[in-house]
Regions:
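Class II aminoacyl-tRNA synthetase catalytic cores and aaRS-like
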Residues: 1-603
Length: 603
């Protein structure tokens, strides 16, 4: 049973109680971190979101009822304590606590709420399985590390809002219930009761609405928007996520990059006291792929890719020969200092790249005496092996790793491998922030399964002016006015200059396989708006959760979202998604049909 707060008002947060208040009466409220009983002295460490303060109940100088109540207190009880602030004796000062120089001599203690024994301790220095933490997320969030993440998230949002407001942006909310216009991933669908058989789509982004806001003359828009994607999860993705979304009129690529560089500089300085140098490095998509095997390269370390196709061309080694004849390439990285790896560890790298569809790896070890060891040595002359090593500036103690396949597989495999080796070798620090822009993405990517082009970003991205003629002759070579901000191997945000001409937009839809009727059905409202005067415009969206993850050094965005989902898009806390009763389904005109495999599908 809990007591009422009647007559008590909190005067201070726990960590606001300091030496300047010595002799003053304060009232604090919070959770019991721990209780120590030393006979006639009971010490209670009380915690709120600011931290801890110690309260003391002295059995020799307090009412028996107060002392008895203090004896009954247990961890995670919620208390209100009123008393006078006093200095701690010299031997009892705790320099590890912000309030370690003082304590509160309790005159009144109320137990506002009792607590059962928690499934895990509210401490940072504990190991708890993720499923248990997330099932009891409200307890997990009490831990200082989780509180710190939530507070940093709040402060970052405030800095962003203030900066964009000062830059002339208007914060405008766009609908959550919209039309399903898939942008690459599956939409979450919401059935309409009023319009049987029709569905809303939850937004993957506010893309179309923010373009309409530019047509409306809003000039500069932003919102911190909730977005949804029904896709497989990974460490840095969630089915519902938050974007810092913006759109600007009468701008070019440089304008958008400039405002976002200054935004990031402001955020990192005010929140982390980190100076981000601007202008940031820019790298064309083609160069990023050639050098790092990724369109979101981690540039905190080297280990760049080298194209050795010409060096090994004409070889009888069938793996290299077949890759080259099929139009692929042979590329390599130099894992500096990894020549000491035992064969078992090298084999683990071979297995690693197989997850990226590579058939394997060739390797060359540069021994300490400069001699070479390789499983492909019998296929090459010593001079040819040395030529490969020299091309990668190999030196004693290095390990050369070679992949031969289609370009996409080689890039994916070596791009991931360099990051895996960097992880194993501890070549990076989470507090080393290396930003860059990747620009000039391909406009289209060919989808073999669907036998058509798909948009690399989305179908509203504007082609480079000089590439417009290629839309009619060779769409695969068209570059987009698109740009991604990358930080330490993660895409922080991406955007583009948009198409503002109706004729070009219709041509893009046609290249993507949309008939005029399909385009009108899906995007007719946008095409209609383009009849009435459209300013040149562009924008960008940052993954807010991902930014916070990187700023806090967390390994997953789950740690920076208050109530996240897990890999199967379920919520361990609420057991969502859940079933609904037949009456609700009947109102929506939906029936659940069990297939022969006993799987449930909506019909």
């Amino acid at each position: 049973m809990g007591e009422a707060m009647t007559g008590l008002k909190r005067s201070h947060m726990c960590c606001d109680v300091s030496e300047v208040l010595i002799g003053s009466e304060v009232t604090v409220m919070g959770w019991v971190q721990r209780r120590r009983d030393l006979g006639q002295l009971i010490f209670i460490a009380l915690r709120d979101r600011t931290g801890l303060v110690q309260a003391v109940v002295d059995g020799n100088n307090s009412a028996p009822e107060l002392f008895k109540k203090a004896e009954s207190v247990r961890s995670e009880y919620v208390l209100a304590i009123r008393g006078k602030v006093a200095p701690r004796t010299e031997g009892n000062v705790n320099k590890n606590m912000k309030t370690g120089a003082i304590e509160i001599i309790a005159d009144e203690l109320r137990i506002l709420s009792e607590s059962e024994t928690t499934p895990f301790q509210v401490e940072d220095e504990i190991t708890v399985k993720d499923d248990l933490r997330l099932k009891y997320r409200y307890i997990d969030l009490r831990r200082p590390c989780q509180l710190k993440n939530m507070i940093l998230r709040h402060k970052t949002a405030q800095v962003i809002r203030n900066f964009l407001s000062d830059e002339g942006f208007l914060e405008i909310e766009t609908p959550v219930l919209g039309k399903s216009t898939p942008e690459g991933a599956r939409d979450y669908l919401v059935p309409s009761r009023v319009h049987p058989g029709s569905f809303y789509g939850l937004p993957q982004s506010p893309q179309l609405y923010k373009q309409l806001l530019m047509v409306s003359g809003m000039d500069r828009y932003y919102q911190i928007a909730k977005c949804f994607r029904d896709e497989d999860l990974r460490a840095d993705r969630q089915p519902e996520f938050t974007q810092v979304d913006m759109e600007l009129s009468f701008v070019d690529v440089d304008d958008i990059i400039d405002v976002n560089e200054r935004l990031i500089k402001k955020v990192f300085k005010e929140i982390l006291d980190v100076d981000v140098p601007i202008p940031m490095q820019r790298m064309k998509y083609k160069d990023a792929m050639e050098r790092y095997g990724s369109d979101k390269p981690d540039v905190r370390f080297g280990m760049e890719l080298h194209n050795i196709t010409d060096i090994v061309r004409g070889t009888e080694f069938v793996v290299f020969k077949n890759a080259i004849e099929a139009g692929g390439s042979v590329r390599a990285i130099n894992a500096n200092g990894c020549g000491h790896y035992p064969r078992k560890q090298i084999d683990s790298l071979v297995e690693f790249v197989k997850t990226y569809k590579a058939k394997g790896l060739a390797w060359i070890v540069v021994n300490d005496d400069g001699s070479l060891k390789s499983q492909i040595a019998k296929f090459f002359t010593p001079e040819k092996l040395q030529e490969i090593v020299d091309a990668l500036e190999g030196k004693p103690g290095d390990l050369i790793l070679i992949c031969a396949d289609a370009d996409r597989i080689v890039f994916d495999s070596l791009g991931a491998l360099r990051c895996e080796i960097a992880r194993r070798q501890e070549l990076t620090r989470p507090d080393d922030f290396r930003f860059l822009w990747v620009t000039e993405f391909p406009m289209f990517e060919w989808d073999d399964e669907e036998n058509r082009y798909v948009a690399e970003h989305h179908p509203f991205t504007c082609p480079m002016d000089e590439d417009l003629p290629l839309l009619d002759t060779d769409p695969s070579k068209v570059r987009a006015k698109a740009y991604d901000m990358v930080l330490n191997g993660f895409e922080l945000g991406g955007g583009s200059i948009r198409i503002h001409r109706r004729d070009i937009q219709q041509k893009i839809f046609s290249l993507l396989g949309f008939s005029d009727e399909d385009a009108q059905e899906r995007f007719g409202f946008l095409l209609d708006a383009f009849k009435y005067g459209v300013p040149p415009h562009g924008g960008l969206a940052f993954g807010f959760d991902r930014i916070i993850m990187l700023m806090t050094g967390s390994s997953s965005i789950r740690d920076v979202i208050a109530f996240p989902k897990v890999k199967d898009a379920s919520c361990p806390l609420t057991d969502a998604p859940g079933t609904v009763d037949d009456k609700q389904l009947d109102e929506l005109g939906i029936a659940i049909v069990k297939t022969e495999e006993n799987e449930e599908t909506n019909e």
